[in-house]
From Swiss-Prot:
Name this protein carries in UniProt: Glycine--tRNA ligase beta subunit
Keyword Cytoplasm: yes
Keywords: Aminoacyl-tRNA synthetase, ATP-binding, Cytoplasm, Ligase, Nucleotide-binding, Protein biosynthesis
Pfam families reported for this sequence: DALR_1, tRNA_synt_2f
Phylogenetic classification of the source organism: Bacteria, Pseudomonadati, Pseudomonadota, Gammaproteobacteria, Pseudomonadales
Xref: NCBIfam families: glyS
Broad enzyme group: ligase
Family membership: Belongs to the class-II aminoacyl-tRNA synthetase family.
GO CC terms in record: cytosol
Native species: Pseudomonas syringae pv. syringae (strain B728a)
InterPro entries: DALR_anticod-bd, Gly-tRNA-synth_bsu, Gly-tRNA-synth_heterodimer
């Protein structure tokens, strides 16, 4: 079957840069779906996206649908004709349904059948609907109308190119009649651009100063920004999201180096970086020590004959924003950070839980409780907790919300607070996302855990549990943050006691009954998904969860040990034995004795197992004391042979009550050794 290349380009006013890639990908996906539904084959696909256009190129697209056969089965033959061979209403109705005379129906089989060959339609007749459906299905949060038209799209449409081979596909979509003329750069080539063929699309636009390939523009910007940064003896800060956004803003990227006055470097560099990145879309430069340089890179959308004019314009635009940041910083520093606390008394944290000031006081007490238990200083943690929310009422954070914690750090430093106290004001918000940086100080870790735990206990205490995708207080993230800090920083904190302490801080504001258990379950349940992401089988998680360890670090150490145990050749058999023993013990009548009496042994295999258990118990006691769980399980794996021999030769439920009870005690002792690490029976 013959094939031709297909190109569709929708021209618009400037598209939202942050959603440009997602719109383009969805456009391609919609066209792929339409082609698949129509049974049209092709050899390759490519999507293009620029500020004023979305385009898809399909290579070697079949020129026509394949013919297809359709078989329709009707009523059984005996129901289609009466005894005299005359057609019944069932037969006549089937023929009418097929739109043919009964004579055209196949009557040779057990059922009437009508076979029809449906000729494939020309691809050109199918493409308009495929393209239109794809555009209508784009993930656009809010569509707009323009002029007096009824059509809606993310931005007003301006032109439409649709070529199949060398021919224009005749159609009208979103108020635009298809043609072969695109448009070039607004300034370099404001005239229409004739697209010679689908394959020539990129080169035709390149000649008109438009780089339609998003990835090409992104690579050009990234490479040139790095080159310019090196020339300035610095390193560019290039967040992927900012790079994507800038690539979505320009059709012909030209990076240029600009500068600002060095006096602004007295302002916390995070504030300067925030305003330059978020508001101006600039790439900031750092020196070898990670300090901000008084220069930045802007990406122009024009190759100017006078780049100095563009540079001067950007420097003029950024100056007021930097001046604002400087003003807020100086205003805030006129008073000590601690004085901002009073303003927080009028800022509501949550209506039922009190003000942000109340929260800071709770965090202070909880951090002081946590700190010495993880090796930190209680007084410094208490101080950091008390100051933790002060910067929320500062001018700087009011203008730049992203500076919360960071501003507090600089103000605390200026006030002469200890370094770890100042750092804790920023580290309280760590980790700020999945895989993000963790606190570097024990004071910071204590405050970070306290802040998150206070939120969890408080919100759970008033019954506002997260449901489905709704989690307005980010409780899942808070729980994961606590776990990451404790596990990855190897901090051994008893969460059971800590949560109880946190509950007590709220007094009558919450309902304490069962609250601690509810919060603990929520926190430890987060570990299930964490381990699944790491490739740990859920059975391993459940085997440890059954023991309800109080420490997240201890929980993790047990999981790692069980994960290693599962790889041992004895693991499956011992898991099955533990399950068998667990079932036997659950059916035991009365209480099981705590001690084993060798005098009731009447089988050599009982003696062998008892001796092996004694030796194993003696060997793993020092391991258990040091939480060497992997070593403990490896040692217990050596019990497989005496355990197997015991069950092959010994009837546990002996007729003699003393013998039977003693065997239960022996098995209970065996199971207890494994339960020192995890419930291995759940691995089976």
């Amino acid at each position: 079957m013959s094939a031709q290349d297909f190109l569709v380009e929708l021209g618009t006013e400037e598209l939202p840069p942050k959603t440009l890639v997602s719109l383009a990908d969805a456009f391609l996906a919609g066209i792929e779906k339409g082609l698949a539904g129509a049974g049209l084959t092709y050899s390759a696909k490519q999507v293009y996206a620029a500020p004023r256009r979305l385009a898809v190129l399909i290579t070697a697209l079949a020129t026509q649908q394949p013919d297809r056969s359709v078989n329709l089965d009707g009523p059984p033959r005996q129901a289609a004709f009466d005894a005299d061979g005359n057609p019944t209403q069932a037969a006549l109705g089937f023929a009418k349904k097929c739109g043919v005379d009964l004579s055209e129906i196949d009557q040779s089989g057990p059922k009437l059948r009508y076979s029809q060959t449906i000729l494939g339609k020309p691809t050109t007749s199918l493409l308009p609907t495929i393209v239109e459906d794809s555009l209508n299905d784009l993930p656009i949060a809010k569509r707009m109308r323009w002029g007096a038209r009824k059509e809606e799209f993310v931005r007003p449409t301006q032109w439409l190119v649709m070529l199949f081979g060398d021919q224009v596909v005749d159609c009208t979509i979103l108020a635009q009649s298809a043609g072969r003329h695109s448009r070039g750069h607004r300034f370099h080539h404001p005239q229409d651009v004739r697209i010679s063929s689908p394959a020539g699309y990129l080169s035709d636009l390149r000649a008109a100063h438009v780089l339609a390939d998003f990835n090409e523009r992104r690579q050009i910007i990234s490479k040139r920004v790095d080159e310019l940064a090196t020339q300035q003896e610095g390193t560019a800060i290039v967040p992927p999201s900012l790079l994507d956004e800038v690539a979505g803003l320009v059709e012909w990227p030209v990076p240029l180096v600009c500068s600002f006055e060095e006096r602004f470097l007295e302002v916390p560099q995070e504030a300067l970086i925030t305003t330059m990145q978020d508001n101006q879309k600039y790439f900031c430069l750092l020196d070898v020590d990670g300090k901000l340089l008084p220069r930045f890179i802007t990406v122009a959308n024009i190759e100017s004959k006078d780049p100095a004019q563009i540079i001067a314009g950007n420097e003029k635009v950024v100056r007021p924003r930097l001046t604002d940041a400087e003003f807020f910083f100086k205003q805030d520093k006129k008073q000590k950070l601690e004085t901002f606390n009073d303003r927080l008394k009028n800022v509501v944290f949550q209506a039922q839980l009190g003000s942000v000031f109340d929260k800071a006081e709770r965090v202070s007490k909880l951090a002081a409780y946590i700190a010495p238990r993880i090796g930190g200083d209680a007084q410094r943690a208490a101080r950091a907790g008390l100051l933790s929310k002060c910067d929320l009422s500062s001018e700087m954070v009011g203008e730049f919300p992203e500076m919360q914690g960071i501003a507090g750090y600089y103000y605390a430093k200026a006030d002469g607070e200890p370094e770890d106290v100042a750092l804790a004001l920023n580290e309280q918000y760590m980790p700020r996302g999945a895989g993000a940086e963790l606190p570097t100080t024990l004071t910071g870790a204590a405050v970070a855990i306290a802040d998150k735990l206070d939120t969890l206990v408080g919100i759970f205490g008033i019954g506002m549990l997260p449901t489905g995708s709704k989690d307005p207080y980010a409780l899942r993230r808070a729980a994961l943050g606590i776990l990451r800090i404790l596990i990855e920083k190897k901090l051994d904190l008893n969460l059971v006691e800590t949560v109880k302490f946190a509950v007590a801080q709220f007094g009558a504001k919450i309902k304490p009954a069962g609250l601690a258990e509810q919060v603990l379950d929520f926190i430890f349940d987060r570990l299930r998904a964490r381990y699944e992401d790491e490739g740990v089988d859920v059975a391993v998680y459940l085997s440890v969860r059954a023991l309800q360890p109080a420490s997240a670090l201890d929980f993790d150490q047990r999981v790692q040990a069980v994960q290693a145990f599962r790889k041992l050749p004895q693991a499956a058999a011992l898991a099955a034995v533990n399950k068998r023993v667990s079932n036997l013990l659950s059916k035991a009548e009365g209480s099981i004795a705590q001690t084993v009496e060798p005098k009731y042994f009447d089988n050599a295999n009982e003696f062998s197992l008892y001796s092996a258990i004694q030796q194993a118990d003696h060997a793993i006691q020092p391991m258990a004391a040091e939480r060497q769980y992997s070593e403990s399980l490896a040692r217990l794996a050596m019990l497989r042979e005496p355990v197997d021999a015991f069950f092959e030769a010994v009837m546990v439920n002996a007729e003699d009550a003393n013998v039977r009870a003693n065997r239960y005690a022996l098995l209970s002792r065996l199971r207890g050794l494994f339960l020192g690490v995890a419930d291995i029976s759940l691995l089976g």
